[in-house]
Amino acid sequence: MGAKDITGRSTTQGFAQQHGGVSDVVVKTPFYQVSCCGPVSWTSGCHSLTESTCSRLFYILLHMGASAICCLLLSKTVVERVWGKAHGIQMPSVLCAHLFGNSDCPVLSGSGAVYRVCAGTATFHLLQAVLLVRLHSPTSPRAQLHNSFWSLKLLFLLGLCTAAFCIPDEHLFPAWHYIGICGGFTFILLQLVLITAFAQSWNKNWQTGAAQDCSWFLGVLLATLGFYSMAGVGAVLLFHHYTHPDGCLLNKMLLSLHLCFCGLLSLLSIAPCIRLRQPNSGLLQASIISCYIMYLTFSALSSRPPETIIFQGQNHTLCLPGQNKMEPQIPDASVAVFSASIMYACVLFACNEASYLAQLFGPLWIIKVYKYEFQKPSVCFCCPQTVEPEDGQGSRARPADQETPPAAQVQSQHLSYSYSGFHFAFFLASLYVMVTLTNWFSYEEAELEKTFTKGSWATFWVKVASCWACVLLYLGLLLAPLLAHHSESPPP
């Protein structure tokens, strides 16, 4: 089993000669022989997928597993039922005295456990991101760090998490808390960049087709109406479930404000002064952003603590679904679980899309992705097919090691996504999951049940701020070309 098992059998004699040298070198080195601990056995079932795609799936599964473990350790119900410990899982006293010299040891559950598991996963991805910087060829020996050594990497990840549990609370929380906050906010900004780039790419692509064919114009119209309909239905449902005539003033003000934002962005998208500098600007991208604003509003409202009022001498809970009636209600976790599922799906999408765009456009992809112009319309609008050469590496097209014919694989020597960018995105995602589960700034008494049923003001305002940041980012994209034109115009 050697490198030929990974790169595939050659279809021509020239291709065999081209890669024969690389295969011989890699097979003969101890570096690749050690990789037999993982790559062949783990990826042998992925005959219909490429190695890089299988690797990406395995890393996603690792991250999902770590996140699930964090949820279990944060759940007071699970800890009490499985271990019977009302105050958390304690480290054995003998091991505690040996490691710390006293009986004051970290609790192996709760927010401290979440911080330590996420510290291990974040360090795991950050180290790989550093080691894989400026990697451009899938045949490079460094690429095996990403695609191989699965058993060793799993043991290394477990070792990092175990080592994190040996760090006392007073040394872990102060520094790692601020690192987590910064990483979490950075990941939120990354998500906002991706959603605005997604909306702009879709609009540019289909507007290009609408200028040539009426069928594309019909597609633009239907998509725009569809997104505005979803945003409108979402707003109605939010007013119905998250407001009450006798309270919930903050929810009413927030929903009204965000609806005004949606209307303002829609008007600016079709304003003549904006379209003069951006001819492709239209309601399609504004409708996508409006729909996303409604989702962020829903996420924020479902994360706030309920409001309590006194009615006829009794306390009544309002401002959450199922709790707006003047009668005792049991908190419903279904909405919170639904919101958390969407959130984690967005996390995985952001990690994968960021790594692809980083490989396609280079380190400055956050800027270049907005400037890309489509030559012809296509249904697959979110993935540009070709870009200009970057740093003398030749034209970067969509690499052919993803479900492409063998003839295309012969010509492809590029990565299908940036390995370093992929791991750095998962580094930020690990920090984002950590601070989200532990209520951001109020992590001391975080519990899974409270996080998803009772909420916290810290999480609420973080999500509201992310919604406002999305509005400002899209507003900047609309106004930046106009402001730049006025600044460059000579005075009369």
UniProtKB/Swiss-Prot annotation:
Protein topology in the membrane: Multi-pass membrane protein
Keyword vocabulary terms for this entry: Lipid biosynthesis, Lipid metabolism, Membrane, Phospholipid biosynthesis, Phospholipid metabolism, Transmembrane, Transmembrane helix
One GO CC term on file: membrane
Matches recorded under Pfam families: Serinc
Subcellular location: Membrane
Keyword presence, Transmembrane: yes
Transmembrane segments: 58-78, 113-133, 148-168, 179-199, 217-237, 254-274, 281-301, 330-350, 421-441, 464-484
UniProt record, GO biological process: phospholipid biosynthetic process
Entry function: Incorporates a polar amino acid serine into membranes and facilitates the synthesis of two serine-derived lipids, phosphatidylserine and sphingolipids.
Family note: Belongs to the TDE1 family.
Protein name per the record: Serine incorporator 4
Native organism: Rattus norvegicus (Rat)
